[in-house]
Amino acid sequence: MESEYREMLLLTGLDHITEEELKRFKYFALTEFQIARSTLDVADRTELADHLIQSAGAASAVTKAINIFQKLNYMHIANALEEKKKEAERKLMTNTKKRGTQKVENRSQAENCSAASATRSDNDFKEQAATEVCPQAKPQKKQMVAEQEAIREDLQKDPLVVTVLKAINPFECETQEGRQEIFHATVATETDFFFVKVLNAQFKDKFIPKRTIKISNYLWHSNFMEVTSSSVVVDVESNHEVPNNVVKRARETPRISKLKIQPCGTIVNGLFKVQKITEEKDRVLYGIHDKTGTMEVLVLGNPSKTKCEEGDKIRLTFFEVSKNGVKIQLKSGPCSFFKVIKAAKPKTDMKSVE
């Protein structure tokens, strides 16, 4: 839901006011939100939306923004935002009811299965026990099982038409199904872009840049799509066009100052310059920087065969925002991809030897 509120706050609200109106909005935001004036003054529209949500929470930020637009007598924006918010809340209520009904049905099925299992033979029982003890028996796997159940609730059967912007080559990694080849892609609709984790390398011939495809039976997480072997991906003939501003946002490397205010779990792709490297036995800590600040990137395992040096750049794919104590950092996961881009060596004048 947070992504929906962020989208409506930006696209339905802040993007529809002029620079002068934005200054007035920021003036009233000082009293509505606990944000420093210095932070508000330099924030662009996207950063402002992030600051508002970080300060008040997603739903509350939209409500407060509506109040400000009403004070400024920008009623067309206030009304549009209010309608979008009600629509999102209705959708949430509908999904909650559906999930509640599904849970009751699942509980009933589980009780029936439990009663039926009492009549199973010893051999059947042993076979089932052997299956259940397998990797999930480890304590650290319990959370993974819970996450799998949560993922199933977000199965999207309705097709989504998107245009492929980018796809990397398949690589091997550990997944819940074991070691397999996967790849990552970026796709877009006419209003937004999404990162996609594709758990079946056979779909690679569908994810060709500029091609329009239809995806169904996929999993939707809070900030990315997951395409599995059960998903359906087909080519479609469509006049589907992605606006330049959406393409630009999809290709941009997020600024470090913006990453530091993102919630944990946010997926990050981008190219960053390295200024410090700390190597340990099973991990490497990279210090990255840009014009807006510095940050650390924690890469677990052996990230790359190419040795990284200060001044090189690292391309991160499917990394996550995480916390190390109070410090915000980027962290690799089981399906992250890491690549070193060597810095160009300065050209030196060739001296002749006589």
UniProtKB/Swiss-Prot annotation:
Polar residues compositional bias, start-end: 109-120
- Give the residues annotated as coiled coil: none
Q: Which GO terms describe its biological process?
A: activation of innate immune response; AIM2 inflammasome complex assembly; brain development; cellular response to interferon-beta; cellular response to xenobiotic stimulus; defense response to virus; DNA damage response; innate immune response
Q: How is it modified after translation?
A: Degraded via selective autophagy following interaction with TRIM11.
Lineage at the top is: Eukaryota, Metazoa, Chordata, Craniata, Vertebrata
Q: Which SMART domains does the protein's record reference? A: PYRIN
Inducing or repressing factors: By TGF-beta.
| Subunit record text | Self-associates; forms homooligomers in response to cytosolic double-stranded DNA (dsDNA) and the dsDNA seems to serve as oligomerization platform. Component of AIM2 inflammasome, which consists of a signal sensor component (AIM2), an adapter (PYCARD/ASC), which recruits an effector pro-inflammatory caspase (CASP1). Interacts (via pyrin domain) with PYCARD/ASC (via pyrin domain); interaction is direct. Component of the AIM2 PANoptosome complex, a multiprotein complex that drives inflammatory cell death (PANoptosis). Interacts with EIF2AK2/PKR. Interacts with MAPRE1.
Q: Which family does it belong to?
A: Belongs to the HIN-200 family.
Q: Where in the cell is it found?
A: Cytoplasm; Inflammasome; Nucleus
User: What is the recorded name of this protein?
Assistant: Interferon-inducible protein AIM2
- Residue numbers spanned by region Disordered: 95-124
Q: What does this protein do?
A: Sensor component of the AIM2 inflammasome, which mediates inflammasome activation in response to the presence of double-stranded DNA (dsDNA) in the cytosol, leading to subsequent pyroptosis. Inflammasomes are supramolecular complexes that assemble in the cytosol in response to pathogens and other damage-associated signals and play critical roles in innate immunity and inflammation. Acts as a recognition receptor (PRR): specifically recognizes and binds dsDNA in the cytosol, and mediates the formation of the inflammasome polymeric complex composed of AIM2, CASP1 and PYCARD/ASC. Also acts as a tumor suppressor independently of its role in inflammatory response. Able to suppress overt cell proliferation in enterocytes: restricts stem cell proliferation in the intestinal mucosa in an inflammasome-independent manner, contributing to a decrease in the likelihood of colorectal cancer development. AIM2 suppresses cell proliferation by inhibiting phosphorylation of AKT1 at 'Ser-473', preventing AKT1 activation and AKT-mTOR signaling pathway.
Q: What is known of its domains?
A: The pyrin domain mediates homotypic interaction with PYCARD/ASC.
**Location, primary (coarse class):** cytoplasm
A Gene Ontology cellular component where this protein is annotated is:
site of double-strand break
